[in-house]
A protein has these predicted regions:
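Conserved ATP-binding/catalytic motifs of P-loop helicase motor domains
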Residues: 1-444
Length: 444
């Protein structure tokens, strides 16, 4: 049986809550999207969400924060009961929100590993009260995917530490094959890096990538741990180019979905609505670039050509509304015009659309921003730059191949997992079903 067949039976026939785990590049997000599409075909009221903007864009969904309308403060309120009551009152006051919660049958959550325990507890309690049911999530079936050995939640503990996780009694499935990486040696190294068990031979291969020469006009993206380092490098690199700055301003609009699936634009966004787009998308309202700038494509334009989210290139010229970019293909470099692109998200019953050239400076990016992305080539410091578990693994697993990997430093002691997450995974795997099938590279 295929992955889809196995999970279709578990979800739609046996009605299990399901957790889909697996290594980076194993197709978790793609499979979750397939399962959501299957639920829609069956006429089941479902919502597909993710915990991050990058992932939500990749699989075409809203963030879970956008769906629930729940944003936790940096620190949990002193009176959680009063906080939950306020949220429930707000939902009951707005008919469309109440109807959305009450009619929902299945909630799909991608990148669940970045969902915190406090957050899932609050959502669980809100769902129970709004739906008038003491069942976990008020009786909503939960289908989640993620890798707890990647990055943890920000300012929160893991969701599996929440009492709610035990209540949900997930049926666990593990995807064991990585399809993002076509090179077996690289795939094997990453699987061992994930659990902190690199061999002497692995380290020799990685050391061979330290100070490696790049023979392409397309410079590798530098992956940093800290945002300030990213901003500094992107700014300095652009300033060093002798060409003039070209500024692109986004058009933010509201729309409604037509029967054809297209979005009919109604009006321009307010400032608050534009802020929703800011927090969800991996692209801002204003982009400053130059001819000669290293850029990253942040939209899936043409999979067959290799023009996908994460593709790297360099701007060669600008013609009217088009930016001409030289991209790094699988076998050769090629130029292609990039036009303004409409990024769409669904938020509280409306479609928010940001139209702008889908390119960002790619001299540097943070590890956090890179989770969920794949790039052709990257420079990584797996030494002094790493300060938390899972960081090195996430950074390394963003790069498609050993050929595209360039290291500043490599220290085996910096490539280690979160012990709590590792213990959880080991326990989960003892009760899990391991599934796999052959799929095309484009599907992952």
């Amino acid at each position: 049986m295929s992955r889809l067949s196995v999970l279709t039976e578990a979800i739609f026939q046996d009605k299990h809550n399901v957790m889909i785990a697996g290594i980076a590049g194993s197709g978790k997000s793609y499979l979750l999207r397939q399962l959501y599409d299957e639920s829609v075909k069956r006429g089941i009221v479902s919502i597909l969400t993710s915990t991050t903007g990058v992932s939500s864009f990749n699989i075409g969904c809203s963030t879970i924060h956008s769906f629930t309308g729940i944003i936790l403060p940096t620190q949990m309120p002193k009176d959680p009961e009063e906080f939950v009551s306020r949220i429930v009152t707000r939902i009951k006051f707005k008919r469309y929100l109440l109807k959305k919660w009450q009619n929902l049958k299945i909630l799909f959550i991608d990148e669940v590993s970045m969902l915190g325990a406090n957050y899932i507890d609050v959502v669980n309690e809100v769902a129970k009260r709004v739906r008038g049911s003491s069942s976990p999530f008020g009786g909503i079936q939960v289908i989640a995917s993620g890798d707890f050995l990647q990055l943890p939640p920000v300012n929160d503990s893991f969701c599996f530490e929440s009492p709610c996780w035990e209540e949900l009694r997930f049926k666990n499935y593990v995807l064991t094959k990585a399809y993002r990486f076509t090179e077996q040696k690289w795939n094997d190294i990453l699987q061992r890096a994930r659990v902190g068990k690199l061999t002497k031979e692995d380290m020799e291969v990685l050391k061979g990538c330290v100070n490696k020469k790049n023979n392409s006009d397309i410079q590798p993206t530098v992956i940093y741990s800290l945002r300030r380092d990213v901003d500094d490098l992107n700014e300095v690199a652009l300033d060093d180019l002798s060409s003039e700055f070209i500024t692109f301003i986004a058009e933010d609009t509201l729309g409604e979905e037509e029967k054809t699936g297209s979005v009919n634009i109604i009006r321009h966004c307010s400032e608050e609505q534009s802020k929703v787009l800011d927090s969800t998308l991996n692209i801002g309202r204003k982009i400053k670039l130059k001819v000669g700038a290293q850029v990253m494509l942040v939209a899936n334009l043409d999979v067959a050509m290799g023009l996908v989210n994460g593709s790297r290139g360099v701007i060669t010229k600008v013609e009217a509304d088009n930016v001409i970019v030289k991209f790094k293909g699988k076998e050769y470099e090629f130029e292609h015009p990039i036009s303004p692109y409409a990024f769409k998200i669904e938020h509280q019953g409306e479609y928010y659309v940001r139209t702008i050239v889908p390119l960002i400076p790619a001299y540097a990016s943070t590890v956090h921003k890179m989770q969920g992305l794949t790039i052709d080539c990257g420079i990584i410091n797996c030494g002094s730059s790493i300060f938390s578990p899972g960081q090195a693994y996430v950074a390394l697993s963003r790069v498609r191949s050993l050929d595209g990997l360039f290291l500043e430093q490599i220290s085996q002691s910096k490539i280690y997992p979160n012990k709590l997450a590792l213990n959880f995974e080991e326990k989960m795997r003892k009760k899990a079903v391991f599934i796999d099938r052959e799929i095309n590279d484009e599907e992952v």
